[in-house]
Amino acid sequence: MAPGLVVGLNKGKVLTKRQLPERPSRRKGQLSKRTSFVRSIVREVAGFAPYERRVMELIRNSQDKRARKLAKKRLGTLKRAKGKIEELTSVIQSSRLAH
């Protein structure tokens, strides 16, 4: 933000910043509709992995810390484990609402 001064730390000509189109790399990690649809179909057909079923059972029995520890052991990092716990908790809640 140059104020048009000739000297000083903020010196320089006043310009309007160019609006550049967003780079494709900025989309990295963002889920597309197609990908989310395919994942939902796979989840429907294949079901849950054995460790996921065990984690869900632990969550149902309100052993959240144990469930987190198991998920971390299986997935490698606590961040991934927290995401998985969140996903499985939402699955449990939606199944409760369905019945």
Swiss-Prot record:
Coiled coil: none annotated. Signal peptide: none annotated. It is found in: Cytoplasm. One of its GO terms (biological process) is cytoplasmic translation. Its main location: cytoplasm. There are 2 genes for eL36 in S.pombe. Belongs to the eukaryotic ribosomal protein eL36 family. Component of the ribosome, a large ribonucleoprotein complex responsible for the synthesis of proteins in the cell. The small ribosomal subunit (SSU) binds messenger RNAs (mRNAs) and translates the encoded message by selecting cognate aminoacyl-transfer RNA (tRNA) molecules. The large subunit (LSU) contains the ribosomal catalytic site termed the peptidyl transferase center (PTC), which catalyzes the formation of peptide bonds, thereby polymerizing the amino acids delivered by tRNAs into a polypeptide chain. This is Large ribosomal subunit protein eL36A. It comes from Schizosaccharomyces pombe (strain 972 / ATCC 24843) (Fission yeast).
